[in-house]
């Protein structure tokens, strides 16, 4: 396939037909039957004639200023219901906490205006002051002027009708405009119930401050275990999906304890205060001397003993005079002796009106979400301590449904909604694992999703001749690593010559920046090698996620074109450890560890008969709280058809937090296409005997149901444009499959404590009433409760039978070259995720804000300039560098 020269051709109609997700054609039949339980609870819906009335809510102060402080809305609306129940005809309502209110049936009139007064004076809600006994500018005056001490004007106006009958129609498989809206109202009813109990609400999950739910993650952060609940339309009827959920919160307790653990110091005097200021900003604290809550905006410039503020002192009947007083003196006058006056104060006022309170008098408010990125150690602790065995999870969710007493809710009752208290039973099928082929064309049959290379050779081992080991670790025996790696490779069929050189980092370089350390190491490598190596083994320091990783990968893959494998010294550097390392090295250097038996014998249904390109697509976003970090879009494409085990990656940056990939087709001013798909199409053509793909199977990760239409009508259109620009022949047939891991459906075996066996597929009972979806457990779950991948087939022009789609998905979970286990999602998606993560290390994202206005960037869909990723060197761009 050759790129077309010249102007971009017209590639589609001006008004293309909008694609919609296809309906389920039929059900799968193959596999051994298995009885399962799901964490869905059947919902009986008898009041289908009920109609939800939606009303818009506005909350303003007397002077017409909008009040939108967090938590105010629910308090105000509770007061409205309490005060004006008769005007509202005694109707209960569901309120989303912001601008929408819902009732069953209409209110007496379409528009209301109510006035309420809240007697609470919480600074958290109103942005007020510390109140009596606290140093600030205009102390007494400000204590009387919080928003909540004033009258609040509430406007309620009719917005829309949402018939509950729409849910019944959706359950019958009909398209319904209001079904999702009605389900959202039902979810809001459950959220409101938990809000009244004081729970933290995070989307459709809720969390209480019961200490038994907390897991200390160190650093002042705790994992908080709660519950997720959502109503779902399924082929078996309406259901309530209830699952265990976890979020991160700031560990409640004294602020100085939080600072000590957050910065891992023992003495409060060792605190890095600029860092503390950044961490504390916008967190809420409660002052123990007056029991009021405040939001932190910063720290004082001076410690309590020296930080002054003006205070008006009255003398008899005169106006009095203003004097400067320190925070410490002020509190002493109020009979509060500070024990740590050398600490700065928390500023809980406003930017131009500071309001100081000593740190030692403040405690962190409970249930504050922690939205910053966790460290690798915190993540590991969270995963380890959040695990629940299947039987325990079943008990927790069942108890939750029983204890929440949903049947007593007046709104649910008025809709005729009754929720069963038992887990829903579903039928599943266990598909047979695909047979693999290893060295000497020997068959390897996985057992419960696992296999090994004991006494086996790799299917296509490479030979490594020109290589070296570089050592950034202070404690490492490179000679032993070299010897053990060579010996292990020999047993797996990989011939590894002795390394040309073993290069240690000198002690002086260890004090330099990561980039300088990498450059110095490369100078030493070049001085000790007669030519460029084909492979470098890099020993990193003991610490994971070390700062050297990104610069090292960029130097090798972008500048030098050298395949590299990084390892971290481990206590257990045994044969299994070296085998796992060699699996990655062999795949990166062009070898193949195993392949499917069907692939080896050219017997993969449909894919084998017609040139077929398989794409895996994913977008990785910056860590929480980093809205300035570009997202990274990665697409991998299969190569060397009819193989489905080899892939090449293409990666681009795009606007932060944007999920839709905008660089699949990327026409330039010179008439060329610099998009991702062109790169992968050319590679397929070159490696597949100059064949063009006549079928393209797309696996897309990371999109929600609300984005399905964009995948079908935006991303797919880009792919078609890229193909038509290169070739004006027939457009390939497409099959588009979404893979979702971020859902809350779990399945359990009924009579055993074990997880669901690998190969289990469910396409009945709890699946969509109309759309073409199924749940697949391709992997084994040895610990915790395993989660299935939820696959949605949005388009199938190729014409797979359901059994063929499900077997293809299962097979693609066994071609992941990095491991000897089946993985939970198809390998192309995992590879795309790995490619995005590794290429993301190429750039220092914290510098993006400074560089985005300079050269080398490309305009994003929002108009802002997003810096481009450095491209891979020509010598490695077609490799599986991401393994």
Swiss-Prot record:
MF terms (GO), sorted A to Z: RNA binding; RNA endonuclease activity
GO cellular component, one term: nucleus
SUPFAM superfamilies: PAZ domain (SSF101690), Ribonuclease H-like (SSF53098)
Matching Pfam families: ArgoL1, ArgoL2, ArgoMid, ArgoN, PAZ, Piwi
Key words of the record: RNA-mediated gene silencing
Alphabetical list of SMART domains matching this protein: DUF1785, PAZ, Piwi
Domain of life: Eukaryota
Domain PAZ: 254-366
InterPro entries hit by this protein: ArgoL1, ArgoL2, Argonaute_Mid_dom, Argonaute_N, PAZ_dom, PAZ_dom_sf, Piwi, Piwi_ago-like
One GO BP annotation of this record: regulatory ncRNA-mediated gene silencing
Residue ranges annotated for the Piwi domain, each copy included: 535-844
Described purpose of this protein according to its UniProt entry: Probably involved in the RNA silencing pathway. May bind to short RNAs such as microRNAs (miRNAs) or short interfering RNAs (siRNAs), and represses the translation of mRNAs which are complementary to them.
Family designation: Belongs to the argonaute family. Ago subfamily.
PANTHER family recorded: EUKARYOTIC TRANSLATION INITIATION FACTOR 2C (PTHR22891)
Name the UniProt record assigns to this protein: Protein argonaute 16
Organism of this sequence: Oryza sativa subsp. japonica
Encoding gene, per UniProt annotation: AGO16
